[in-house]
Amino acid sequence: MVLSTLIMRASDGLPLSASVDDGQENLSEQKKQCKLVTQKLSANSADRASIESGNYVIHYLMKDGIVYYCISESSYPRKLAFSYLDELDREFQKSHGQEALKEGVRPYKFVEFDTFMQKTKRVYQDTRATHNLDKLNTELQDVTRVMTKNIEDLLHRGHSLDHMSDLSSNLRTESKKYRRAAQRINWEAMIRQYIPFIGVGLIGLFMLWWMLF
């Protein structure tokens, strides 16, 4: 389940909003890590990623200068986590997007956005809900290729989020290559399957032409 949500400005890490009631979980370390991750983000970074942190996973979505984070249990489906973040992005951009990027914005200026976060989070708490399963099958972008990184690798071993973007790009390229190869193989198999019939048909036409002319 989604345990906590944070929204930050990508350019300077300014916290814009956060979920207020995070239950009994102590997520202070993961929240600090979200701030550190924001500092590492750049224009070349992957626009979405999952970062393993102990028993939890930090999912982020970076879009239009804003970074949306949700901290979930490690067993929570990534597809639901990113669908949740996509919904937050759509609503936040509609209501606060332009203002959030202005200079002089105070930290947590949009704390009232928590009302929408809490309402949306409740929809995504039950992974068995029909509504959620429909989203998995119809509305989601393809996040199966979203890279997963370990927080230790990212913060203490200097691994780059830009590298994650490169890996995602490579995966997309490889996927297209294999898809083209599969189409070629299917085409060749179809030719092998029907070429005897085509050959017989051509011979028959030739014999008919020979007899008539």
Swiss-Prot record:
Signal peptide: none annotated. The chain crosses the membrane at residues 193-213. It comes from the Eukaryota. One of its GO terms (biological process) is vesicle fusion with Golgi apparatus. It holds the Pfam family Synaptobrevin. Keywords: Coiled coil, Endoplasmic reticulum, ER-Golgi transport, Golgi apparatus, Membrane, Protein transport, Transmembrane, Transmembrane helix, Transport. One of its GO terms (molecular function) is SNAP receptor activity. It is a single-pass type IV membrane protein. InterPro entries: Longin-like_dom_sf (IPR011012), Longin_dom (IPR010908), Sec22 (IPR044565), V_SNARE_CC (IPR042855). It is found in: Membrane; Endoplasmic reticulum membrane; Golgi apparatus membrane. Residues 132-192 form the v-SNARE coiled-coil homology domain. Its main location: membrane. Residues 1-192 are cytoplasmic. SMART domains: Longin. Residues 6-117 form the Longin domain. GO terms for cellular component: endoplasmic reticulum membrane; ER to Golgi transport vesicle membrane; Golgi membrane; SNARE complex. PANTHER family: VESICLE-TRAFFICKING PROTEIN SEC22B (PTHR45837). Required for transport from the ER to the Golgi complex. Belongs to the synaptobrevin family. This is Protein transport protein SEC22. The lineage of its organism: Eukaryota, Fungi, Dikarya, Ascomycota, Saccharomycotina. The gene is SEC22.
